[in-house]
Swiss-Prot record:
Functional summary from the UniProt entry: Catalyzes the initial step of the lipid cycle reactions in the biosynthesis of the cell wall peptidoglycan: transfers peptidoglycan precursor phospho-MurNAc-pentapeptide from UDP-MurNAc-pentapeptide onto the lipid carrier undecaprenyl phosphate, yielding undecaprenyl-pyrophosphoryl-MurNAc-pentapeptide, known as lipid I.
Localization per record: Cell membrane
Native species: Clostridium perfringens (strain 13 / Type A)
Known EC number: 2.7.8.13
UniProt cross-references to Pfam families, sorted A to Z: Glycos_transf_4
A Gene Ontology biological process term: peptidoglycan biosynthetic process
Keywords tagged on the record: Cell cycle, Cell division, Cell membrane, Cell shape, Cell wall biogenesis/degradation, Magnesium, Membrane, Metal-binding, Peptidoglycan synthesis, Transferase, Transmembrane, Transmembrane helix
GO cellular-component term (any): plasma membrane
Name of this protein: Phospho-N-acetylmuramoyl-pentapeptide-transferase
Membrane topology (UniProt): Multi-pass membrane protein
Domain of life from the UniProt record: Bacteria
HAMAP family, A to Z: MraY
Cofactor: Mg(2+)
Record-stated family: Belongs to the glycosyltransferase 4 family. MraY subfamily.
Amino acid sequence: MIDPKIVMAIVISFIVASILGPIIIPLLHKLKFGQNIRQEGPKSHLKKAGTPTIGGLIFIFATIITMFIMVGNPTDEAMIALYSFVGFGFVGFLDDLLKIIKKKNEGLTSGQKMILLLIVSGFLTWYAYKYIGTSINIPFLNGQINFGLFYIPFVMFYFAGVTNAVNLTDGLDGLATSVTVLVTTFLGIISYNLGHISLAIFCVALAGALLAFLRFNAFPARVFMGDTGSLALGGAVAMVALILKMPLILVLIGIIYVIETLSVILQVASFKLTGKRIFKMAPIHHHFEQLGWSETKIVSVFSIITVVFCFIAFASL
């Protein structure tokens, strides 16, 4: 039987996000918080210029509100997941805000962004090292690896990788939202099965909020999540998986994040080494756009792939 608390968390976050959307989106319009579109991107995206951004605030606020309604006194692990969610989201918010002020797709400098991300991930790494332990589970092998002191650089690299991967995935209407609904649902189920109830409520509250946000973010998007949303989502899924000692499971359930990131790495490496590009455009979702796929088709196919790999991940546990 499904725990009523889990159902209530999904329902409440969905309702709260559904209420916040029609409040926040017009406010973003009024403040002229419109998205600047990269000229080197797909030409079909130029018409999206001016679409409100920083919409990630909708599901961030909805998740926080739901957490404190459903869990009066969250556990330390739920609070640290919330901190990761909000901390990375705040860095994204600053980046988005500067892009709007400068009226171009350049916010924080790479150095500024790196310092802020290091501050957030540094605290999370310290917490993980001290309270979670340095062992992680290995999918399919039913065993663990103890990283010892190497755990610290591993986790720092891990946070950088996951947050940037989710950020890269947020390039089509509804793509990062749809994929992450599935990822957080998976993590919520695993958290619940392992007895991490507060953490499970956080995951499903986020999933419910994302489902509501999808109403505004699906093609044609009425609002973009911005770096505010994508970095927050990356921070959330990375921290939850780490708490569960399952960071490597993200390679499976976050297969789309992985593919998106690899496509960029391969594209850059190929062009620098040979002067030729592997894909028509990177990240890979733009490659499929150039092949004539609609945004809706790409999102649907990538979501189906995520579902398949979530089942594979279940089998690996």
